[in-house]
Swiss-Prot record:
GO molecular function, one term: structural constituent of ribosome
PROSITE patterns: RIBOSOMAL_L27
Disordered as annotated region, ranges: 13-37
Protein name: Large ribosomal subunit protein bL27
GO annotation, cellular component aspect: cytosolic large ribosomal subunit
An individual GO BP term: translation
Superkingdom per UniProt: Bacteria
Key words of the record: Ribonucleoprotein, Ribosomal protein
Pfam families assigned to the protein according to its UniProt record, in alphabetical order: Ribosomal_L27
Disulfide bonds: none
Post-translational modification: The N-terminus is cleaved by ribosomal processing cysteine protease Prp.
Family: Belongs to the bacterial ribosomal protein bL27 family.
Encoding gene (name): rpmA
Length: 97
């Protein structure tokens, strides 16, 4: 009789399996945004604003790179200004000597 009950014995896990999830990943921060402040003096070629798309438009003495980064074309003082009613632009004005 004892031999028969051992053959029918079933063992169950006392802890559930670990499982898996489809979450748990995140992308690296892209470090976008202003790199120079209003009123700050910058040299030519300095990055003023990193962006995706045109949140801020280039103004006087400011160029726009292939990835929409705004950069200074000349040495001068940075000014963030309004462009029309709903847009913004950044300009660089040369320092008078």
């Amino acid at each position: 009789m004892l031999k028969m009950t051992l053959n029918n014995l079933q063992l169950f896990a006392h802890k559930k399996g670990g499982g898996s999830t489809s979450n748990g990943r995140d992308s690296q921060a892209k470090r976008l945004g202003a790199k120079a402040a209003d009123g700050q003096t910058v040299t030519g070629g300095s990055i003023l604003y990193r962006q995706r798309g045109t949140h801020i438009y280039p103004g006087v003495n400011v160029g726009r790179g292939g990835d929409d980064t705004l950069f200074a074309k000349v040495e001068g003082v940075v000014r963030f200004e309004r462009k029309g009613r709903d847009k913004k632009q950044v300009s660089v004005y040369p320092i008078a000597k």
